[in-house]
Amino acid sequence: MGSSDSSSGSAQKATRYHHQHQPPPPQRGSAPELPPGFRFHPTDEELVVHYLKKKADKAPLPVNIIAEVDLYKFDPWELPEKATIGEQEWYFFSPRDRKYPNGARPNRAATSGYWKATGTDKPILASGTGCGLVREKLGVKKALVFYRGKPPKGLKTNWIMHEYRLTDASGSTTATNRPPPVTGGSRAAASLRLDDWVLCRIYKKINKAAAGDQQRNTECEDSVEDAVTAYPLYATAGMTGAGAHGSNYASPSLLHHQDSHFLDGLFTADDAGLSAGATSLSHLAAAARASPAPTKQFLAPSSSTPFNWLDASPVGILPQARNFPGFNRSRNVGNMSLSSTADMAGAVDNGGGNAVNAMSTYLPVQDGTYHQQHVILGAPLVPEAAAATSGFQHPVQISGVNWNP
């Protein structure tokens, strides 16, 4: 008796230990613990053989990883939260009902739309490597697209369903997957059941064109943002480089500062001919007398002016006007008549009271302002501007022609 009691007690302890240390079955809606890096991404054959067929035969599944949901009672965007596992695609066991009691067409209507089949059914064949081996047909795969609204004017969406169902050798639904016969008041409901279980994979297709446009827009926005961010640094670097190395390229802020001192720099150049006050005017007059050319004077570059408007190469102050019969080269500027540099020198000798006004007034009224300003400043013209101004001629007044008959 003692030995039997001890053996029965040890058996009870072993049973209790087994139940205590046995892992609990996974609950519905809870994701199973998969090792890092593992994903549930079976092939079509694996889905049919190891999951759908065993589900139809009521055999134990390898893992409780596919939820049982009637897909046609929900919209596709509501299904991901009902899945057991999945990130970009979700798997479900779902029943199928008939659309009509005496027909074989399935009911594809959902809550706010319907599923529409696309393409033809794809047979799922057993894998085999033997030469001339006839591969067994295991099931059928059908692709469907979800449309919002009512047929036939539904709005197509990007939600896709792959539906897997079993077939026998003749291509019809297997007997194990057919609903059992029922009696009583539930006969009408049972007559609409087409399949007990089908296996469905749901995912949302990504529009590659829209994704590409979005990526390009993002890159464009990033480029603009980078350019705006880098602009202050470029402006600061340009100002520093221009001051340290005498570069011809300056930042916009520096150009603004130089433009504000343009007239000051125009009349305050030293050494070469334009110093402040009466000294600069005297130098200009002396240079005018010494030059044999009537209207061309060349100024050397000056580095002490706030605006370096003289190029290293000699530049003419004013362009030479062409002579035509009856054309008077004299121009009245203010109270002075300037036809040559001698007139300018005389104005300077008289005290220079009107010389500055004459020079200031002469610039804006001179024809070809754009060309002459670049000549005075010593800035090289771009090819397009040079070509446009190369054929410029001064206005010609021909005597004896009545322009207003």
From Swiss-Prot:
Keyword Glycoprotein assigned to the entry: answer is no
| Record-level Gene Ontology MF annotations | DNA binding
Q: Which GO terms describe its cellular component?
A: nucleus
User: Which stretches are labeled DNA-binding?
Assistant: 138-211
Q: Subcellular localization, per the record?
A: Nucleus
Against PROSITE patterns, the record matches this protein to: NAC (PS51005)
**What function does the entry list?**
Transcription factor of the NAC family associated with the grain protein content (GPC). Accelerates senescence and increases nutrient remobilization from leaves to developing grains. The tetraploid cultivated wheat (T.durum) and the hexaploid wheat (T.aestivum) carry a one bp insertion generating a non-functional allele of this gene. They have a delayed senescence and a lower grain protein, zinc and iron content.
Region of interest (Disordered), ranges: 1-39
What UniProt keywords apply to this chain's record, in alphabetical order?
Answer: DNA-binding, Nucleus, Transcription, Transcription regulation
Which ranges carry the NAC domain? Answer: 34-205
Q: What else is known?
A: High grain protein content (GPC) is a desirable trait in breadmaking and pasta wheat varieties because of its positive effects on quality and nutritional value while Low GPC is a desirable trait for barley malt and beer production.
* InterPro entries membership: NAC-dom (IPR003441), NAC_dom_sf (IPR036093)
**Can you cite a GO biological process for this protein?**
system development
* Species of provenance: Triticum dicoccoides (Wild emmer)
Start-end of Low complexity biased regions: 1-10
Give the protein name, as stated in the record: NAC transcription factor NAM-B1
Could you give the domain comment from the record?
The NAC domain includes a DNA-binding domain and a dimerization domain.
